[in-house]
Amino acid sequence: MSKLFQARFATTVNDTHCLPATPLREVAFAGRSNAGKSSALNVLCNQKRLAFASKTPGRTQHINYFGIFAKDDLLAYLVDLPGYGYAAVNHETKYHWNALLSDYLQEREQLVGMVLIVDARRGITELDEQMIQWFVPTGKPIHILLSKCDKLNKSECKHALEDVRKQLQQYDPALPDGTGESQQLTAQLFSSTKRIGLEEADNLIIKWLFEAETHEDEITS
């Protein structure tokens, strides 16, 4: 059983000054409104309504923290960031979201990686690129889940994944000529509905959150 199955709601904040004052590792989930972020969180944690998928895009305006527990011991956090890209949101709200997201992604020391949910049918959008550009300078990993891949046929899935991986090369400072396989920015196919790619995503998130712990266990054994 995955450690993510033990996730439960911890807190919600609307300002970076209110973020939990703990040294625990965090993995952030980001994505456009309606890209399938809440569904991805729910299926990865094997829960139906851990993250609330609003029928009104852009409604979630806070950073939601979900703690991963072992009985009553808090081990780490999954962090649900506000969805972005919904046109009906007013300018003031958009400005607040941008400031909140950029500050969190660029300055949060406890953040060890970002899972970016991208609709496989749309590919990486300009706003997705903005998220990547905010986060890449930290040197921390970004993993893209190409969601709703069940809506594409096998050939379309292959091309969608190839296109995104090629696009990611240009953002990796370790690949100055824009070629080669990026280690910092990775991508996979994913479907919450058909449960495609769950194991791959789960393994990576667990690695980010508990890699040091696993290494220490190997040393002591």
Curated annotation (Swiss-Prot):
<keyword id="KW-0717">Septation</keyword>
<comment type="similarity">
    <text>Belongs to the TRAFAC class TrmE-Era-EngA-EngB-Septin-like GTPase superfamily. EngB GTPase family.</text>
</comment>
<keyword id="KW-0131">Cell cycle</keyword>
<dbReference type="InterPro" id="IPR006073">
    <property type="entry name" value="GTP-bd"/>
</dbReference>
<feature type="binding site">
    <location>
        <position position="38"/>
    </location>
    <ligand>
        <name>Mg(2+)</name>
    </ligand>
</feature>
<dbReference type="InterPro" id="IPR027417">
    <property type="entry name" value="P-loop_NTPase"/>
</dbReference>
<keyword id="KW-0547">Nucleotide-binding</keyword>
<dbReference type="InterPro" id="IPR030393">
    <property type="entry name" value="G_ENGB_dom"/>
</dbReference>
<dbReference type="Pfam" id="PF01926">
    <property type="entry name" value="MMR_HSR1"/>
</dbReference>
<keyword id="KW-0342">GTP-binding</keyword>
<dbReference type="GO" id="GO:0046872">
    <property type="term" value="F:metal ion binding"/>
</dbReference>
<dbReference type="GO" id="GO:0005525">
    <property type="term" value="F:GTP binding"/>
</dbReference>
<keyword id="KW-0460">Magnesium</keyword>
<feature type="domain" description="EngB-type G">
    <location>
        <begin position="23"/>
        <end position="211"/>
    </location>
</feature>
<keyword id="KW-0132">Cell division</keyword>
<protein>
    <recommendedName>
        <fullName>Probable GTP-binding protein EngB</fullName>
    </recommendedName>
</protein>
<dbReference type="GO" id="GO:0000917">
    <property type="term" value="P:division septum assembly"/>
</dbReference>
<keyword id="KW-0479">Metal-binding</keyword>
<feature type="binding site">
    <location>
        <position position="60"/>
    </location>
    <ligand>
        <name>Mg(2+)</name>
    </ligand>
</feature>
<dbReference type="InterPro" id="IPR019987">
    <property type="entry name" value="GTP-bd_ribosome_bio_YsxC"/>
</dbReference>
<comment type="function">
    <text>Necessary for normal cell division and for the maintenance of normal septation.</text>
</comment>
<dbReference type="GO" id="GO:0005829">
    <property type="term" value="C:cytosol"/>
</dbReference>
